[in-house]
């Protein structure tokens, strides 16, 4: 079984590819994605479950991002930063089994790895605001 960090990185990579290929359906993108990211079936199922849930809430998540990005539009965000924010907001709002502080920290670390140091700070600021407005506690999870 792969780590949750690796799941998150694969999701960000997938979301980036999906962002670059607008109009392509989730299932078609997944078929192409697995050609370059071979995993065992159980790990694929875990990643796909997260991705299907993200796709279900993607429009609401993007609206949430728009509401927090001041004097900026979603289209002007660096695509990788947008993908990291989508994942982080999904976890904070929809994954009650993951403490939000963990989601924020993981998102910041992924931003530092795949984007810039400044992106890490930007992602942290946006996700912290989302957390505060969500009413969840930073270390609260509900199994």
UniProtKB/Swiss-Prot annotation:
GO molecular function term, any single one: RNA binding
Pfam families from the UniProt entry: NusB
InterPro entries named in the record: NusB-like_sf, NusB_fam, NusB_RsmB_TIM44
Protein's GO biological process: DNA-templated transcription termination; transcription antitermination
Keyword terms: RNA-binding, Transcription, Transcription antitermination, Transcription regulation
An annotated GO cellular component: cytosol
Entry superkingdom: Bacteria
Function, as annotated: Involved in transcription antitermination. Required for transcription of ribosomal RNA (rRNA) genes. Binds specifically to the boxA antiterminator sequence of the ribosomal RNA (rrn) operons.
Family, per entry: Belongs to the NusB family.
PANTHER family given in the database record: ANTITERMINATION NUSB DOMAIN-CONTAINING PROTEIN, N UTILIZATION SUBSTANCE PROTEIN B-RELATED
Name this polypeptide is given: Transcription antitermination protein NusB
Organism from which the protein derives: Methylacidiphilum infernorum (isolate V4)
Gene name in the database record: nusB
